[in-house]
């Protein structure tokens, strides 16, 4: 038997469960055994994106002693759109050059 941790974070709270599983258990099996999907109905069990220690893994990867399984939520905003909006805001606030988008020249 090995001990692993299953974590799921929301903007305001995080759930962390330590469970004991049989050696050879996969990431997906451990998530199901932990019961975290029942505690958080917002987790889409059909489209899980999982990771171990900040690295995305396939659901069939076998676990090792002390692994931390992370359940990732989908991105809310497109990263390119978010970057574009931040750049436009910086131009409006004078923190960026209106033509080049770079830092304004200090004189």
From Swiss-Prot:
For this protein, the record's Pfam families field holds:
Ub-RnfH
User: What ranges does the record give for the region Disordered, renumbered to this chain?
Assistant: 82-107
Q: Which HAMAP family match?
A: UPF0125_RnfH
Q: Which family does it belong to?
A: Belongs to the UPF0125 (RnfH) family.
Query: How is this protein named in the record?
Result: Protein RnfH
- Tell me which species this is from: Pseudoalteromonas translucida (strain TAC 125)
């Amino acid at each position: 038997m090995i001990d692993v941790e299953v974590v799921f974070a929301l903007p305001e709270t995080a759930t962390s469960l330590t469970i004991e599983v049989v050696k050879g258990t996969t990431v997906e099996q451990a998530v199901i055994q932990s019961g975290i999907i029942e505690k958080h109905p917002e987790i889409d069990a059909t489209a899980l994106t999982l990771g171990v220690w900040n690295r995305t893994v396939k659901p069939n990867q076998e676990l090792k002693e002390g692994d931390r399984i992370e359940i990732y939520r989908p991105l809310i905003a497109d990263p390119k759109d978010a970057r574009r909006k931040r750049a436009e805001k910086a131009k409006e606030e004078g923190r960026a050059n209106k033509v080049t988008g770079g830092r304004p020249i200090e004189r």
